[in-house]
């Protein structure tokens, strides 16, 4: 959040990497502005997180693959921290891997894709175990799930199932893993499982204001002016 250039011994937010939009947003311009060579530090962080995040996925959720929550640091922590409105966000790792896929799309570097495929696959594989069937539907959703720092109908926060942001990050992670496996000609069985899960992700919902719903239920507050715009991912 603060980087190395700040004037505080104890920087705001501990100067950690906030990966529920902040870190990603800082790197969004890299490929499109032909500055892809600036992403190496980000890739190093992702590689480290795929290790600590595999332990978190296994021990906290009983899931394969790897994941990270909303915040990490120089020790590459992957577990939840702080309050539920921030911490119960299981998509930080998967969101970061979109930068790996974007690099391939911009460069066509198949050697790069092969090198990073295990990390891309691992982030998607987590969702195969983590996403659960929503009662009364054929959908599978993330649960627990939060829309970071947001809550329905103006409430401070709500831990729920299948926030739109979660579903779309899962869709992106699974889709890039499927496409990468097709390009590399590997993991056909896992690819089919991921394709099946993609078909069960809920479609985005349109609410009474004509808005893209933040949750599966129509509970958006049109007067919400909170600065956290992670949901802009969708």
Summary of predicted features, one role per range:
Residues 1-24, 59:
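Short, structured secondary-structure elements
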Residues 3-14, 68-88, 145-163:
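Acidic/His metal-coordination segments adjacent to aromatic residues that form catalytic metal sites
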Residues 19-59, 67, 75, 85, ...:
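Active-site core of glycosidic bond-cleaving carbohydrate-active enzymes
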Residues 1-5, 46, 58-63, 135, ...:
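Short, solvent-exposed turn/loop segments enriched in Gly/Ser/Thr/Pro and often Arg
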Residues 122, 126-180:
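Acidic/histidine-rich catalytic neighborhood
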Residues 1-6, 10, 101, 108, ...:
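An acidic- and aromatic-residue-enriched active-site/binding cleft used to recognize and process polar
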Residues 2-4, 115, 132-143, 186-192:
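Short, glycine/acidic-rich hinge or "gate" loops at secondary-structure transitions
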């Amino acid at each position: 959040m603060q980087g190395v250039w700040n004037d505080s011994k104890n920087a705001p937010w501990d100067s950690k990497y906030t990966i529920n939009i902040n870190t990603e947003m800082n790197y969004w311009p890299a490929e499109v502005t032909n500055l892809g060579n600036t992403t190496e530090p980000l890739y190093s962080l992702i590689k480290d997180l795929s290790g600590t995040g595999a332990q978190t996925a296994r021990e906290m959720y009983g899931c394969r693959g790897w994941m990270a929550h909303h915040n990490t640091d120089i020790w590459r922590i992957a577990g939840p921290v702080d309050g539920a409105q921030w911490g119960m966000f299981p998509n930080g790792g998967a969101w970061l891997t979109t930068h790996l896929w974007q690099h391939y799309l911009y460069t066509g570097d198949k050697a790069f894709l092969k090198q990073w495929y295990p990390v891309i696959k691992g982030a998607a594989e987590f969702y195969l175990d983590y996403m659960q069937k929503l009662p009364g539907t054929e959908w599978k959703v993330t649960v627990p799930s939060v829309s970071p720092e947001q809550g329905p109908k103006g409430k401070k926060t709500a831990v729920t199932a299948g926030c739109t942001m979660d579903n779309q990050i899962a869709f992106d992670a699974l889709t890039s893993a499927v496409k990468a496996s097709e390009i590399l000609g590997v993991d056909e069985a896992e690819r089919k499982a991921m394709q099946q899960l993609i078909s069960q992700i809920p479609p985005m919902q349109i609410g009474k204001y004509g808005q893209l719903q933040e949750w599966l239920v129509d509970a958006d507050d049109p007067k919400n002016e909170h600065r956290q715009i992670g949901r802009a991912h969708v």
